[in-house]
């Protein structure tokens, strides 16, 4: 019995525990990267979008805010849809293709969606 327990302990502490620690580290890095992307998105938003969209509003067209209900109503409730809007623009909103990088657009879109989910 003791020999079996000792062998199981070696397996657990030699293989399973290091794997669990490794996986925990990977998941914590993912959350840190996501937080950094949102922070970067917030900074890009402040410099390029807030003049018209401060607080998730729309100074030009008040019926098309960045609030979740309006994003859903206009089919803009995903990162991909928001990136397409930022890239190409539409109506009074200019496109930002070539003005900000694709990764910056993705960070802004993630930030906008996160804020919309939180109610701005």
UniProtKB/Swiss-Prot annotation:
Binds 1 heme c group covalently per subunit. PROSITE patterns: CYTC (PS51007). Its main location: other. Residues 1-35 form the signal peptide. Heme c binds at residues 49, 52-53, 93. Keywords: Electron transport, Heme, Iron, Metal-binding, Photosynthesis, Signal, Thylakoid, Transport. The keyword Cell inner membrane does not apply. GO terms for cellular component: plasma membrane-derived thylakoid lumen. One of its GO terms (molecular function) is iron ion binding. HAMAP family: Cytc_PetJ (MF_00594). Belongs to the cytochrome c family. PetJ subfamily. This is Cytochrome c6. It comes from Synechocystis sp. (strain ATCC 27184 / PCC 6803 / Kazusa).
């Amino acid at each position: 019995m003791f020999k079996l327990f000792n062998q199981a302990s070696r397996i657990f502490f030699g293989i399973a525990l290091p794997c669990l620690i490794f996986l925990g580290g990977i998941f914590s890095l993912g959350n840190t990267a996501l937080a950094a992307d949102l922070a970067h998105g917030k900074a890009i938003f402040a410099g390029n979008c807030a003049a018209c969209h401060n607080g998730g509003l729309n100074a030009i067209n008040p019926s098309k805010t960045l609030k979740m209900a309006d994003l859903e109503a206009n089919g803009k409730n995903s990162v991909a849809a928001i990136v397409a809007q930022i890239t190409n623009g539409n109506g009074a909103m200019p496109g930002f293709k070539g003005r900000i990088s694709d990764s910056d657009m993705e960070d802004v879109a993630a930030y906008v969606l996160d804020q919309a989910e939180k109610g701005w």
